[in-house]
């Protein structure tokens, strides 16, 4: 309801919304009343023209989605059970301050959506989350990434400063350079994996045996002790396989240097990157663009493809950032977007991935954000508009207006002034 109104700049009739959303007018009117009374993010305006949403200052659909994640009983229920496996149903109802019958109805309804969309459910005897383990972990990577800011660390039993130190030292072992965003993502993935592993839930994936052995042999005693004290688990091969999954897959290269070396020695990597390079060069050629950091972009895209279902930023729970990013690119640079969309769909077939909108948008975001100097090039390639300024006061007034316009629009316009008395064409 809210997303439909947000994506439409015009007034929408209630009957039109009812048809689009497959929902009765009566229910929509009830929702409208509740939303306008209970939320301060927006006002849903009503008139004889229909309905229209008006967001309040510093509010948006994104802030609305974030508020839902914070306040929704359904998401609170999932989080409580994830962090407290085997909790009794009565304890959950007490924490949510709802009756047992209401809780059971909520779980029954929620399980239908969870099974259909994520291939797992909530079991109530006692409470636990069961199903496809990889999908369970990926869901909660994405959930905690979208719901909590870095400073709002939700895992109370794992000290954030200790977690930062552990992640920092693990990175140092592999000599991996990292930024704030990547560091935060690794923290979330590791802690989600810890909660599942602690409760005897395992994933079975290929791993880089050499890397596992390196970590076992090169982790010093002080760090090993800190890990075992923090997680209350023995630091051994199983711990590494379950906690550091997916970063120890054999297809993952932790530095661009490792990746470039693999192109020279690994036939499969060489073949894949050749196809990727061709796609990127085709996009650049079609749009009259240079691609100065092609090797870096190949490395990032290759990594994104293999880590896609382990990277929380590749999907979403409520707010689809990649979709809105791609939509904005389509609006601002339609020719580039068409090339990217076609190219990224082809890119997904190289990795045997489904050509989904979510996956394609994730690849588009990755390319646009990592392509060096892309936005300046696109603006330079735009046709410039010729502007002639004529003043009916004096020539210096025309020069002043030229300076004002140049300040606001920069190189987008070619501006001239004239003092001629003949303005006929």
Predicted stretch roles:
Residues 1-425:
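A cross-family "folded-core" feature that marks the main globular domain of proteins
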């Amino acid at each position: 309801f809210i997303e439909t109104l947000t994506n439409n700049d015009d007034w929408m009739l209630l009957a039109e919304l009812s048809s689009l959303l497959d929902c009765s007018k009566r229910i929509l009117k009830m929702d409208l009343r509740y939303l306008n009374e209970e939320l301060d993010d927006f006002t849903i305006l009503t008139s004889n023209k229909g309905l229209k949403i008006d967001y309040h200052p510093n509010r948006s659909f994104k802030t609305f989605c974030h508020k839902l994640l914070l306040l929704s009983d359904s998401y609170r229920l999932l989080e409580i059970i994830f962090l407290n496996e085997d909790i009794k149903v009565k304890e959950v109802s007490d924490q949510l301050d709802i009756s047992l019958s209401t809780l059971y109805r909520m779980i029954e309804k929620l399980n239908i959506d969870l099974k259909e969309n994520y291939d797992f459910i909530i079991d109530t005897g006692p409470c636990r989350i069961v199903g496809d383990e990889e999908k369970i972990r990926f869901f909660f990577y994405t959930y905690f990434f979208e719901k909590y800011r870095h400073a709002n660390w939700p895992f109370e039993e794992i000290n954030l400063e200790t977690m930062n130190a552990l992640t920092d030292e693990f990175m140092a072992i592999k000599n991996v350079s990292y930024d704030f965003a990547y560091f935060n993502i690794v923290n979330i993935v590791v802690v989600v994996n810890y909660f599942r592993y602690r409760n005897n839930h395992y994933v079975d994936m290929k791993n880089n045996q050499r890397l596992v052995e390196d970590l076992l042999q090169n982790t010093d005693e002080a760090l090993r002790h800190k890990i075992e004290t923090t997680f209350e688990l023995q630091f051994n091969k199983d711990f590494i396989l379950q906690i550091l999954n997916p970063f120890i897959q054999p297809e993952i290269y932790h530095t661009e240097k490792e990746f470039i070396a693999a192109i020279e020695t690994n036939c499969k990597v060489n073949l894949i990157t050749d196809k990727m390079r061709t796609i990127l060069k085709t996009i650049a050629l079609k749009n009259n663009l240079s691609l100065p950091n092609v090797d870096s972009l190949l490395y990032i895209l290759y990594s994104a493809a293999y880590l896609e279902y382990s990277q929380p930023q590749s999907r979403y729970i409520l707010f689809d950032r990649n979709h809105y990013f791609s939509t904005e690119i389509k609006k601002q640079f339609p020719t580039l977007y068409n090339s990217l969309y076609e190219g990224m769909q082809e890119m997904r077939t190289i990795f045997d991935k489904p050509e989904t909108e979510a996956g394609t948008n994730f690849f588009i975001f990755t390319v646009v954000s990592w392509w060096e100097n892309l936005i300046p090039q696109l603006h330079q390639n735009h046709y410039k508009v010729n502007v002639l300024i004529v003043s009916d006061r004096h020539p210096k007034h025309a020069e002043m207006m030229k300076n004002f316009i140049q300040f606001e629009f920069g190189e987008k316009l070619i501006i001239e002034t004239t003092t001629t008395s003949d303005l006929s064409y």
